[in-house]
Amino acid sequence: GISKPVQKSAANEIREGRFCKKCGARLEYSFYHYSQLGDYKCPSCGFKRPEIRYDAYDVKVGEQLSFAVEDKHLVANYKGFYNVYNILASYAGLRTAGFSGEHFQDMLNHFNPENGRMEQFRIQGTGVTLNLAKNPAGFNQNISAVMQDKTPKDIIITINDNAQDGTDISWLWDVD
């Protein structure tokens, strides 16, 4: 997880999972990353975010991502704060399975996301980034990634309601 606030803009975002899964009371957040992620507790029954075993700190988001975990400084050529969570989940899985993480940075350097996940390619000499979203949290993070990149850009948003991706696009109304 990430034990300290990183983004300032997330405070006004529509949240998923605002209520305690044990008693139904409204959760209290000391800080919030996006969607339901952050530091929360239930004022009624004491349910709270689990202790963080692998904590990302010194998180920086921009043209690339960087953070530290277990005194390892990791850098990835990805955009979007949500990718800190994705990378951290991969690292935690590796460590939980008993591996050292010694070559984790090398793996990051050679990993190439595909299928619309910050996929980079060129069309007639122009750089294009394709990023798929299938729910409000994902779409909000795509918007955040675009806004964090201060370089001039043209933005095209396309909506797909083909059967393989789901024909119900009503979730778009929940995007901030």
Region roles according to the model:
Residues 37-50, 78-109:
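A conserved, hydrophobic alpha-helical segment in the catalytic core
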Residues 73-81, 127-129:
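A short glycine/serine-rich beta->alpha loop
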